[in-house]
């Protein structure tokens, strides 16, 4: 950057989440303008827009569907002008079907806010009847915090409107009900793939000078969390999931299923903090990053690119969009979390289930059933499957070494943020091992598609990085292969294994494209 050699900013136009949220912004802008000009109505806060006023049959957000039926011509015209052609067909702009998801999102957010306000109002009333005026005042302030949030920022944080940066599936750790007054002023939001670790039941974090502890996941009345069974083959590490019983044998290698069949849930409504807060101390907050990313499906219509090196080594790239991934958080020791089906209370596995627990949001005893579950974030993104015919790829440790060498090389050589790309060693349906690289951005940012078309540059940069490091050949360090995210594989990563493969791939040339 200092010498003036830096890649120009790159923004893909085909990210469906960016496209959809811009469509939402056009529709809501037209709705707000119509309400102001024809009805003199103006909503500044979340409560104004999402809650029903006394004596009113509906909330303003519930009128959006009627305004968009049929979709006004000026809205359709604006969408046709600003969205790329592939997005028009994918979202259903021409026939107006795109509006259904907007209305569904608005209804979900309305239900969440209505439920939260009702819970705090109930607790405020109980405190008042118990002559706890201080506690009643705190719950009143919590209600004000929820209802007086600026509307546009609230819509962006709820994944309805676009915001700066690539879209993510954000969830919140709710703190307004806690005993610290700081909780009513905080908005602790994270990308769901990060939140399943940082906000998982039992995890701790420091914010606003207060130590918070997650007490469970947020349950919305009338809405059930998505759950699925899954297992990982102990032989080839092939991942399988389903809503019903899984096949008794691995579909990739045929090995009889000997790994545990677990269940995950997607905490899409967020998390709830323990009402009792603490003070930060000298001991770091407790947190567990035990888990992994798995490939559920590679998507469809993969474009193939074949590369060949002077040594005879070959590389096949199959790249495309809409690959489906699942990021799992399996708790300390990989034993999962105990979660209540009714109130969402949760905790890590400490050997036995507690005899009783308290609803973390309402503060009342709950007798709901408890289940052992993992936490998950599922999403679609751009994906690249890479098959290699090169020496030195006989073990999974060697595959992991090459994986992280290529990711670091692609980040340096193609000027891609390392946090925007990830990868796994993947056992395909035929049992063969390979690498899967993916964009960490839901919907895809086009990064791995660039890697597929410039694999030679990524390999060259990886070779320079690994070859120039000063650590021992039989080991690795944070200057070549190691990152905090691949800590579980640190002992398997070695520079010599990476150099063996990368040197055989040096000088790659494009052989065929399909």
Language-model segments: which ranges?
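Short peripheral tails and domain-boundary helices/loops at the edges of structured domains
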Residues: 220-248
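Extended, highly charged accessory segments
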Residues: 9-12, 16-209, 215-218, 246-514
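Conserved segment of the helicase C-terminal RecA-like domain
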Residues: 1-9
């Amino acid at each position: 950057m200092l010498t003036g050699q830096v890649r120009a900013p790159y923004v893909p136009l085909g990210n469906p989440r960016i496209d959809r949220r811009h469509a939402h912004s056009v529709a809501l802008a037209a709705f707000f303008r119509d309400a102001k000009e024809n009805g003199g109505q103006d909503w500044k806060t979340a409560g104004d827009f999402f809650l029903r006023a006394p004596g009113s049959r509906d909330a303003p957000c519930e009128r959006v569907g009627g305004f968009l039926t049929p979709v006004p011509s000026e809205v359709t015209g604006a969408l046709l002008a600003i969205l790329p052609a592939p997005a028009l067909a994918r979202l259903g702009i021409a026939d107006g079907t795109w509006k259904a998801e907007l209305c569904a999102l608005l209804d979900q957010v309305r239900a969440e806010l209505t439920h939260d306000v009702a819970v705090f109002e109930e607790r405020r009333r109980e405190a008042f009847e118990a002559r706890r005026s201080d506690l009643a005042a705190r719950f009143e302030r919590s209600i004000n915090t929820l209802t007086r949030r600026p509307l546009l920022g609230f819509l962006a944080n709820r994944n309805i409107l676009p915001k700066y940066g690539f879209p993510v599936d954000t969830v919140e750790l709710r703190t307004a009900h806690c005993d610290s007054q700081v909780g009513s002023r905080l908005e602790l939001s994270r990308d769901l793939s990060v939140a399943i670790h940082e906000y998982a039941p039992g995890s701790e974090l420091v914010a606003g000078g207060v130590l918070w502890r997650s007490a469970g996941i947020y349950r919305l009345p009338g809405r059930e969390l998505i759950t699925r069974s899954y297992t990982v083959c102990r032989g080839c590490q092939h991942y399988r999931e389903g809503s019903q019983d899984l096949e008794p044998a691995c579909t990739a290698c045929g090995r009889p299923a000997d790994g545990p069949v677990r269940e995950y849930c997607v905490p899409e409504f967020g998390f709830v903090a323990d009402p009792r807060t603490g003070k930060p101390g000298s001991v770091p907050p407790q947190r567990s990053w035990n888990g992994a990313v798995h490939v559920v499906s590679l998507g469809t219509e993969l474009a193939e690119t074949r590369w060949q090196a002077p040594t005879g080594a070959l590389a096949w790239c199959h790249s495309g969009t809409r690959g489906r991934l699942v990021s799992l958080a399996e708790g300390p020791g990989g034993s999962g979390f105990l979660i209540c089906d009714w109130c969402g209370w949760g905790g890590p596995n400490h050997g036995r289930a507690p005899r009783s627990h308290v609803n973390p949001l309402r503060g009342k005893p709950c007798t709901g059933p408890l289940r052992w579950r993992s936490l998950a974030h599922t999403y679609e993104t751009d994906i690249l499957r890479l098959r290699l015919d090169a020496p030195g790829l006989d073990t999974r440790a060697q595959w992991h070494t090459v994986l992280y060498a290529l990711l670091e090389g692609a980040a340096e050589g193609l000027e891609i943020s390392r946090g925007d790309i990830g990868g796994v060693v993947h056992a395909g349906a035929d049992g063969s091992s390979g690498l899967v690289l993916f964009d960490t951005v839901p919907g895809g940012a086009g990064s791995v598609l660039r890697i597929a078309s410039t694999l030679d540059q990524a390999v060259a940069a990886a070779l320079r990085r690994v070859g120039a490091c000063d650590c021992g050949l039989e080991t690795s360090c944070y200057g070549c292969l190691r990152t905090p995210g691949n800590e579980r594989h640190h002992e398997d990563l070695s520079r010599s294994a990476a150099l063996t493969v990368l040197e055989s791939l040096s000088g790659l040339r494009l052989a065929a494209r399909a």
